[in-house]
Amino acid sequence: MSYNIQAGISTTHFHQYLTHSWKHVLPDAERLTNLDSIACLASNFDLVGLQEVDAGSLRSGFVNQTEYLALKAGFTHWHHQTNRTIGNVARQSIGLVSRFRPTLLTEHKLPGRIPGRGALRVEFGSPGAQLVLVIIHLALGRRARLQQLKFIGELITDDPNVIVMGDLNCRSRSPEMDQLLGDTGLCEPTHDLLTFPSWRPSRNIDHILVTPSVKVERVSVLNYPFSDHLPVAMDVLLPGNVTLRS
């Protein structure tokens, strides 16, 4: 599952971006309750990629939200990568919670005029028979996204079994998505899954992409509006030589 959780902030109307803007810098009592709901959902999955997760700052009550979700949902393994820090106020991150033990994690800064975007590459299994998972949150501008997806393509160029997930901030048939799929052999099993805004979805900017060796059994958007995005869920069948260990 891939989910942009907006630092645990629930948003149900556009006007709340203004009226609830203080929640992006200050703690609020509802945040942990919302995270508990997200943890309950996440507990149904084996691998979860998180975007806009806070790594422990003033606004989150100094709670590392990736760790919190992992513990609440019963995940054994977790990791966060902080891409942008605003003093003690916010530590914007991407995160992984997993039932399987990673064999290697590497953090990458993504190119772009404005810093603060990253990619987390996670390897599972044995060399030569491994699954590579990449969790990303891309820039708002198209030029930066094109650069960032070129970087992602180079990051996975030699890997046969790959899953890329995250908030790409672009649609299925956008030029930047066409570039990535053309460069890598990744595919999107189902196009135009609408995830944003969560209360009236009209844009498909959250994606899970796979290489042909990863067989997709099911993919859907889940109607769990605990953020301003909806989560994307996918069930996959891995090649027989790929073994994930807990």
Predicted regions and their residues:
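Active site of divalent-metal-dependent phosphoester/diester hydrolases
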Residues: 57-62, 76-98, 115, 169-233
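Active-site beta-strand/loop signature of hydrolases that rely on acidic residues for catalysis
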Residues: 1-4, 35-60, 122, 132-136, ...
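Short, solvent-exposed loop/turn segments at secondary-structure junctions
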Residues: 5-8, 55-56, 85-86, 100-103, ...
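Surface-exposed cleft-lining segments at the edges of enzyme active sites
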Residues: 20-27, 53-56, 106-110, 134-142
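Charged helix-capping and loop-helix junction motifs
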Residues: 62-66, 147-153
